[in-house]
Amino acid sequence: MNAEKKMLRHAFGKAAVHYDHVADIQRDVGARLMAASVIDDIPATVLDAGCGTGHGLQLISIRWPQAKVIALDFAAPMLRRIPADDAMAICGDIEALPLASESIDLMWSSLAMQWCDAAQVVREAQHVLRDGGYLVASTLGPGTFAELRRAFVGVDDFQHTNDFADVGALRRALVDGCLTPLTIRRVELVRHYADLRSLLASVRDLGANHVAARNRRRGLMGKSAWRRFAANFERMRTSSGLPLTYDTYLLIARK
């Protein structure tokens, strides 16, 4: 595991204690992903890859109550919050799944792929899925946190958000990984916050504040820079509050 991934794992491990209280976006996207999963087959074994604290497990157990479910996450504190009876928990990396070839009927992964190399995740899915098995995933697209990027214009030259794969890259990852795309659907979700600190806290408490970029800010922002950043963001305020966009993609593919 490289240094960036270790830092990301640490960020999500720290977020575990707050995660369920602020994971509104994960619950929303998970429900949308399940609704989009028009799959007639009944999977015997389901992997929740990047399961977090286990919200997806609830959706899976309702949809496929007879399935054997494996919950996998690389942050052990997340796994410790999952009731023991809900699934077999494995601490592991979705870019290097510790599972046997062709051992899974359906791989579910909601809002985890964006922290990884999408092509590698698809290759791992192709490896563990049985013939005819499904990858059902959601991920973030390049429009995510667009407001943060706009607010930092003229403040500094650091990169403050991650680079997320666009629809073309996602489609290529599926096809190159020998999976047949069945659904690729974009859903733009916007959340609103009363003030900037609560907006930033929501990102931090989800563990999504780690930026994997060479030119990311490594120290604290100065008071002058903060004031300019806050003023820029305030100009985006609507009647609902300060907006923050989650540009999401729902992906369903078959081996």
List each model region and its residues.
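A short SAM/SAH-binding and catalytic strip from SAM-dependent methyltransferases
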Residues: 105-119
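A short acidic, Gly/Pro-enriched loop at the edge of an enzyme's catalytic core
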Residues: 95-107
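Conserved alpha-helix/loop element of class I SAM-dependent methyltransferases that forms part
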Residues: 24-43
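A short glycine-rich, Lys/Arg-flanked "PGG" loop and its adjoining helix->strand segment in the class I
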Residues: 119-134
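Class I SAM-dependent methyltransferase SAM/SAH-binding core
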Residues: 45-97
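Conserved catalytic/acceptor-binding region of the Class I
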Residues: 134-198, 206-218
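N-terminal, positively charged/glycine-rich alpha-helical extensions of SAM-dependent methyltransferases
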Residues: 1-17
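Conserved Class I S-adenosyl-L-methionine
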Residues: 53-55, 183-255
